[in-house]
Amino acid sequence: MQLDPGLVTGPEMYRFLISAVVPRPIAFVSTRARDGALNLAPFSYFNAVSSVPPLVAIAIVDRPDDPKDTLRNIRETGEWVINLVDEALLPAMARTAGEWPRTTSEFEVAGLTAAPSERVAAPWVRESPLDRKSVV
């Protein structure tokens, strides 16, 4: 299949890319806002990009008029945690995927434990088998 990026819409390109890159790892990203509000959200545009130094990348769609809480928190603090999602965590992760008010903690929505991190202010998901603390 050939696809000319100049001839398709953004949503069409998105659907193509998410169906073409499989299996797609999920970054379950936890952040803390400057005011202390917690956020937890899944992102499917995520991957490891280097082992030395260890680097990962996530892509968050920017909504100029109303940025996602995850992006807003990373911009405010420069810190986030990527939590690994295993099969047991899938139902809880799915509950966090909706649009929630900024003051709503998706940890509570999903029934997950926000565990304190040692190196960053953002908590990690205690139920996750692996996490990666990150700083911009």
Question: What are these model-derived regions, one by one?
Answer:
Residues 1-39, 47-136:
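Active-site-proximal mixed secondary-structure blocks
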